[in-house]
Amino acid sequence: MADFAATDQLLTREFNVSARRIEGPELCSLDPSLKPGLAGAFLYETDTMLRPERLCREWRERLMCRGVRFVESCEVLSAEKEADGIECVITSKGPMTADGYVLATGARSGQLGHLFGCYLPIQPGKGYSVTMPRPAICPSYPMLFPEHRVGVTPFQEGYRLGSMMEFVGFDEQIPSSRVEQLKRSAEPYLKQPHTDGQSETWYGWRPMTWDSLPAIGPASGLRNAYVATGHNMLGLSMAPATGKMIAAMIAGKGPELDPSPFDPARFARA
């Protein structure tokens, strides 16, 4: 518990985010889904959870109502540049022009950075999840078990385990061994860590950077091109702040947060 207490102290000191420390004997009273004998936990009562697929669907619907147009199954082939900016991007559905261009293509950003004249050493970090019916004794809270690097998310209609970090390129397979390993990871902590019914497996590629910081800011030498990628394992958490920073830059305003640590040009200087 000492290591986690140090993390809690840092979060309290730097961000005014503190947790309630719960010793082992109290855990089962807090959440009966937990096994007896655990050392303890830190409860961050302001934390919450969401289903990313539903959030993205809702974003899409709301943006379309505001006039945003989504062009799907469209491959970006190249970018035509003028003196100090991008004139248009050439796609499989024809040229597209805009006042500003933002490269926000997640784990694929390393393959597309050259369009903006950027060196982006972003690697795909593959993770897995399995979503299944809720167990009879289901956790009441979303939980992280750092020793086994597994996250537990209880939904109204289901229950999800997520974990893993593999550097295997853009591999699209979901090995059954990984799914079983994921299920086993929660067994030391939960009375009913998984259920038998119909389950849904998933994989995704996280955009990993070698210094664990995202790349947010102008593309070097281009007045109308910006980068917003490389958020590692915190893309959803950092999305709102990233959007505000990029919007401020495009509008010619100073962002509220110092963007220099996230400068995409740092990779070229390394």
Q: Which residues fall in each region the model found?
A:
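Mid-domain beta-loop-alpha active-site segment that forms a flexible
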Residues: 43-61, 107-108, 178-185, 235, ...
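Conserved beta-strand segments of alpha/beta enzyme cores
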Residues: 18-20, 69, 119, 197
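C-terminal catalytic lobe of FAD-dependent flavoproteins
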Residues: 15, 52, 146-147, 171-173, ...
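Dinucleotide-binding Rossmann-like beta1-alpha1 core, especially the glycine-rich loop
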Residues: 1-24, 186-187
